[in-house]
Amino acid sequence: MNMNLNPPTSALQIEGKGSHIMARNVTCFLVRHTPHPRRVCHIKGLNNIPICTVNDDENAFGTLWGAGQSNHLEKNRIPFAQCSYPPSTAVQDSPVRGVSPAPNSAKVPPRPHSEPSRKIQECFKTSNENPLVIKKEEIKAKSPPSPPKACSTPGSCSSGMTSIKNDVKANTICIPNYLDQEIKILAKLWDILHTDSLAEVLQWLLHASSKEKEWVSALIHSELAEINLLTHHRRNTSMEPAPETGKPPTVKSPPTVKLPQSALAKSKVLTRDTEGHQPTRVSSQGSAENKEVPKG
């Protein structure tokens, strides 16, 4: 195998053509800075101290490279990373077209693995990672709650309202209102005080002691509570379903006590004796009266 250890001829041609451009004693080379590559030149200054200058002359840069030389590099398969001078024709075939390079290096594409291109690709790879995209959750959090929708059917609305009312009633504590039972309270007061006049009831309320009032009020309230409990129990019993046969409920009669035959015989004898003695008494009384009458 023939191994080509000599440097490529394209590099020699580059150095030959670049020598007539650089009139001064200058060493030029390309340095890739982020975000854009620039040509940095070291010029000899006073006391032979090198001075770094940047030369972005497009004409000088274009004369260094031609279309034939770039094609020659592609034929020799020289990698882009090893070549110190990027070809000028690669601007038209730039893989990254969305990124605009600097105006001084308009024909030079940016590095595909540079920090700006990598950041742009990472930012716009997905919309979730893009900070400019507003997420739906944030919109829902900012949007006010939607007003209640109108009911499609009146039955559903009424059922919903009744269920809400029932829940409220179940959660609230019911306090009995005795103002609705004034008539019953007055009737109880009339029964206790044995009167039918409101004036006497008012007089008793004015002159009665606090203990008497408390006792009477407790008695009235207890009686009214018992009445309410009885009515509630009756309503519950009436709401219970009747038996499936449809027969009316039979009222149970009190149990009859059967007496033995000896006791029945004795009771019959006693009744006969009482019936026999009554007429004798009457007759004796009548005979006595008859006896007394002639004496008078």
UniProtKB/Swiss-Prot annotation:
In which residue ranges is the amino acid composition biased (Polar residues)?
153-162
Instruction: State the residue spans of region: Disordered.
Output: 89-121, 138-162, 232-296
Q: Which domain of life is it from?
A: Eukaryota
Chain intervals with Low complexity compositional bias: 245-260
* InterPro entries from the UniProt entry: TBATA-like
Regions of biased composition (Basic and acidic residues) lie at: 112-121
Descriptive protein name: Uncharacterized protein C4orf17 homolog
Q: Native species of this protein?
A: Macaca fascicularis (Crab-eating macaque)
The organism that produces this protein has a lineage beginning with: Eukaryota, Metazoa, Chordata, Craniata, Vertebrata
